[in-house]
């Protein structure tokens, strides 16, 4: 008799996705981050659900409701910090996952890649509206600064900003709708992740060599389930260490001051995972130009498959491209550092140079070096 997991309509879907899925035999730990992202998403939805049971999305009580969660709710402090630091772990996994895709040429699965870019944007939107909810100083001013960027859109900008605010400034209506967005978006992310997986399983996984591995596949379970569990243990260990030893390491002290529209913090900055984009935004002295650069810094990922000039898919055997890839990583780390610094000399010029290098690397240097490598292979 055939096993129920292969015949039952629901079990069959799970079986084909996680158990009998043919997987390349040589994929490395860099392929672990997809499942870790799934784990992060589940953790964020669960901790978020329990936080939502005690949180009140109202300007007069939001800040004190978060304090109440930390002080009075059983293990409320733990749930709150798991949720806050879980977001950081989510973005670490997300950036590693994208970096893997860039390095090994996974972007050649175009539908999977484009859904992935859409997922990135949705996760960023979720994290942004979530940061506003505690209604501290950085929540309020972060929301004010970032939503205000839309006013750079010609003709409809101001109307659009006031429509999003639900008034003439960030206030009660803004907080309520941001809470609604923050609640619904993770479920949209879950649906998109399912579509992402659907498209991936149409083609099968890529592997470090970038060479088709159809003749050398192994079942996902038990070989990769056990590897994924190891990765999950590392993730949980790191998250628990962060949450229990230094819960505020990645947060901003300003967010422990209740939101006050009459007092602007000295340095308005987003959470660490947005600093690279914030640095690119600030490096351009023109408002509209900055907004366009900010958008392009993320949306440039959509154009990566079109910029592929190499005859080889992966960078595994391309040392010059590898050098440029790691230069790009170093550049992004530099931008992240600059985004957290005040707007003064020498940070301004360093940020501008790093921003120029970011676009120059992706749009010009990498495609050119790939062409040179093609020529070298002919020798």
UniProtKB/Swiss-Prot annotation:
Binding site for a ubiquinone: 201
InterPro entries the record matches: Cyt_b/b6_C, Cyt_b/b6_C_sf, Cyt_b/b6_N, Cytb/b6-like_sf, Cytochrome_b, Cytochrome_b_C_euk/bac, Cytochrome_b_N_euk/bac, Di-haem_cyt_TM
Membrane topology according to the record: Multi-pass membrane protein
Cofactor note: Binds 2 heme b groups non-covalently.
Transmembrane keyword on record: yes
GO MF assignments: metal ion binding; ubiquinol-cytochrome-c reductase activity
A biological process term (GO) from this entry: mitochondrial electron transport, ubiquinol to cytochrome c
Binding site for heme b b566: 97, 196
Subcellular compartments: Mitochondrion inner membrane
UniProt entry keywords in alphabetical sequence: Electron transport, Heme, Iron, Membrane, Metal-binding, Mitochondrion, Mitochondrion inner membrane, Respiratory chain, Transmembrane, Transmembrane helix, Transport, Ubiquinone
Essential cofactor(s): heme b
Sequence positions that bind heme b b562: 83, 182
Entry-linked Pfam families: Cytochrom_B_C, Cytochrome_B
Coiled coil location: none
Listed transmembrane segments: 33-53, 77-98, 113-133, 178-198, 226-246, 288-308, 320-340, 347-367
GO cellular component: mitochondrial inner membrane; respiratory chain complex III
Function: Component of the ubiquinol-cytochrome c reductase complex (complex III or cytochrome b-c1 complex) that is part of the mitochondrial respiratory chain. The b-c1 complex mediates electron transfer from ubiquinol to cytochrome c. Contributes to the generation of a proton gradient across the mitochondrial membrane that is then used for ATP synthesis.
Family: Belongs to the cytochrome b family.
Miscellaneous field: Heme 1 (or BL or b562) is low-potential and absorbs at about 562 nm, and heme 2 (or BH or b566) is high-potential and absorbs at about 566 nm.
Assembly mode: The cytochrome bc1 complex contains 11 subunits: 3 respiratory subunits (MT-CYB, CYC1 and UQCRFS1), 2 core proteins (UQCRC1 and UQCRC2) and 6 low-molecular weight proteins (UQCRH/QCR6, UQCRB/QCR7, UQCRQ/QCR8, UQCR10/QCR9, UQCR11/QCR10 and a cleavage product of UQCRFS1). This cytochrome bc1 complex then forms a dimer.
Protein name: Cytochrome b
Gene encoding the protein: MT-CYB
């Amino acid at each position: 008799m055939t096993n129920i997991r292969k015949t039952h309509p629901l079990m069959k879907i799970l079986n084909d996705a996680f158990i009998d899925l043919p997987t390349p035999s040589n994929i490395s730990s860099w392929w672990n981050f997809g499942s870790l992202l799934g784990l992060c998403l589940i953790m964020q939805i669960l901790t978020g659900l329990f936080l939502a049971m005690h949180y009140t999305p109202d300007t007069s009580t939001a800040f004190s409701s978060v304090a109440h969660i930390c002080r009075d709710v059983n293990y409320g402090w733990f749930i709150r910090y798991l949720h806050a630091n879980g977001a950081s772990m989510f973005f670490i996994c997300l950036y590693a996952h994208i970096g893997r895709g860039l390095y090994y040429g996974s972007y050649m699965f175009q539908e999977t890649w484009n859904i992935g870019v859409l997922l990135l944007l949705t996760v960023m939107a979720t994290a942004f509206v979530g940061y506003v909810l505690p209604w501290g100083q950085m929540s309020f001013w972060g929301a004010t600064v970032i939503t205000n960027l839309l006013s750079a859109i010609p003709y409809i900008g101001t109307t659009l900003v006031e429509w999003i605010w639900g008034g003439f400034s960030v206030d009660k209506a803004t907080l309520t709708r941001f809470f609604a967005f923050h609640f619904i978006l993770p479920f949209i992310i879950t649906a998109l992740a399912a579509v992402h997986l659907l498209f991936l399983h149409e083609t099968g996984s890529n592997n470090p060599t970038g060479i088709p591995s159809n003749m050398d596949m192994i079942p996902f379970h038990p070989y990769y389930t056990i590897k994924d569990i190891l990765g999950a243990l590392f993730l949980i260990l790191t998250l628990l260490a962060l949450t229990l030893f230094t819960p505020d390491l990645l947060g901003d002290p300003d967010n422990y001051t209740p939101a006050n529209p009459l007092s602007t913090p000295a340095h308005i900055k987003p959470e660490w995972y947005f600093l690279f984009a914030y640095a690119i935004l600030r490096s351009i002295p023109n408002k509209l130009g900055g907004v366009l650069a900010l958008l392009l810094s993320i949306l440039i990922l959509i154009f990566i498959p079109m910029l592929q000039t190499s005859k080889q898919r992966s960078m595994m055997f391309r040392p010059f491209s590898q050098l440029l890839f790691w230069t790009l990583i170093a550049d992004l780390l530099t931008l992240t550092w600059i985004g957290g610094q005040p707007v003064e000399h020498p940070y301004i010029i360093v940020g501008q140079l790093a921003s120029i290098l970011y676009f120059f690397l992706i749009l010009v240097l990498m495609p050119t070096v790939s062409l040179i490598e093609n020529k070298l292979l002919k020798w």
